[in-house]
Design a protein with these regions (language model features):
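Conserved beta-strand elements of the Class I
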Residues: 11-13, 178, 211
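Conserved acidic residues
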Residues: 45, 177, 208
Length: 242
């Protein structure tokens, strides 16, 4: 597990959401892994991820190499994304999660983790964490990942409603929580990771080092006001805000 001693810098890796653009994240991580010449989880004390970044973060924290994760992406991501509707996409995502993570829970992680999801009803973050040291004062009731399987937490972080169905998870306290993609709260989870380091781990800001990997910006071609696609996108935005 990570050493959260104030004597050494706390090294944070933050991975953005972005769907299939996670291939870009993996390209950057491949270079980092080549530089440090060891598994990435050995070089970072906290690895936070949202959506596609959550998949990568969880696999890195479980000790997988970037090559292994890239192979999973190349084999399975096109299959999930090519499904016709949200039910089929969600079923494919659940199947993939169960195959990759099996029965693993958060106590299997080799370093500190934060998997960012969004509570559907109250529109607030729910972050699945590994270490009791990340508990922000709720030490007495903390359990790694709320007792939820890694597979279910990652599926929730990727459940970009309405393109995927909402994900229901059951905590070890028996609570049923309906979750959607963490990107609705923080597509870039860096601030949540820094909050853990400063507020929960009580580390001074000068002892924090952050590597934040986004997925790039890809402007869409300008569309005419008379375009049906433009009006459909505007309608979708309004629905998401309601």
């Amino acid at each position: 597990m990570a050493d959260f001693s104030a004597k050494t810098p706390c090294r944070i890796l933050s991975l953005d959401g972005g769907g299939a653009k996670g291939f870009y994240t993996l390209g950057v991580l491949r270079e980092i892994e080549g530089m440090v010449k060891c598994p990435i989880h050995e070089k970072f004390d906290l690895i936070f991820g949202t959506s596609t970044g959550a998949i990568i973060a969880a696999l890195l924290a479980l000790g997988r190499s970037v090559k292994e994760i890239s192979d999973i992406y190349e084999k399975h991501v096109p299959t999930v994304m090519q499904k016709k509707n949200r039910r089929e996409k969600s079923l494919a995502l659940a199947k993939l999660g169960d195959e990759v993570f099996k029965e693993d829970k958060f106590d299997k992680m080799k370093t500190g983790v934060g998997i960012v999801t969004t509570r559907w009803v109250i529109e607030r973050p729910m972050i699945f964490k590994t270490s009791i040291e990340q508990a922000h004062g709720r030490v007495g009731t903390f359990s790694p990942g709320f007792g939820v399987k890694v597979s279910n937490a990652v599926q929730a972080s990727c459940s970009a409603y309405p393109f995927f169905e909402r994900k229901m998870v059951k905590t070890d306290k028996g609570d049923l929580v309906e979750l959607i993609d963490g990107g609705y709260c923080a597509n870039n989870p860096t601030l949540y990771a820094i909050a853990d380091a400063i507020m929960a781990l009580k580390l001074p800001p000068e002892n924090i080092r952050v590597v934040s990997i986004g997925v790039g910006v890809y402007p869409s071609p300008k569309q005419s006001w008379f375009s049906s696609t433009k009006w459909a996108q505007m309608l979708m935005s309004v629905q998401l805000l309601q």
